Regions:
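A domain-level signal for the structural core that forms small-molecule/cofactor-binding pockets
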Residues: 2-209
Length: 209
């Protein structure tokens, strides 16, 4: 027997009477990225390709998927008060907090002419950085030190912290995170010299044993 009632799971019925579904918001975003030839690897920022309201829709979809994951882990989320709202919490955590560097624009950073013609090396740090291993999605926690030999332009010291937080708030391996952070700093202030040191604990090693 063929059902005439559209089945909706994470999709939205389009209301045209034929029971077909609109594609999930993640599928629409992926299609847009592919059409633009844009990379969407784990540590890429895709904010330029998100339309207004889509991040909220994506958060709802992610919560649905996390709910499915918990059920597949045989966790009774309907009767366990500790996990009843876990899916919503995890979705918000990923999109708005720990992976915000993928979905949100870079913090605004103003640069200024180096009118004093400073050319001495200075350092900023330790800066607390938090990320996640892109292999297992478990935390990477540590500190970052940035050494700069100024060029024609300079930025405020607090801006290094904001940019580092934005870059590290994505799934990463540490080596790539350092390269991305260096590229962003070079674009912002074009230093004569730049050095970055990261000292971090990787919980894919500590937690998993």
């Amino acid at each position: 027997m063929t059902s005439t009632v559209p089945f909706v799971s994470n999709g939205v019925a389009n209301g045209n009477g034929n029971g077909s579904l609109n594609p999930q918001i993640s599928a629409r975003i992926r299609e847009r990225l592919r059409e633009a030839g844009a990379s969407f690897l784990a540590n890429d920022n895709i904010a330029d390709h998100l339309q207004p309201g889509e991040l909220d829709q994506l958060q709802v979809e992610v919560a649905d998927k996390v709910r499915d994951l918990l059920r597949s882990l045989v966790i009774d989320i309907d009767n366990d008060h500790n996990t009843h709202e876990t899916a919503e919490r995890v979705a918000k955590m990923y999109l708005q907090e720990v992976f915000k560097g993928r979905y949100h624009q870079q913090p605004k950073v103003a640069s200024f002419p180096n009118v004093k013609q400073l050319d001495e090396i200075y350092t900023v740090g330790p800066i607390t950085v938090r990320s996640a291993c892109s292999h297992h999605l478990v935390p990477i926690m540590g500190n970052c030190w940035i050494g700069i030999k100024p060029g024609a332009r300079v930025i405020g010291l607090s801006k290094f912290t904001r940019v580092a937080d934005w870059v590290f708030s994505r799934p990463h391996i540490q080596e790539e995170a350092v390269m991305i952070l260096a590229d962003e700093i070079e674009k912002l202030c074009e230093p004569q010299g730049l050095g970055i040191i990261i000292k971090a604990q990787h919980y894919c090693m500590k937690w998993r044993g």
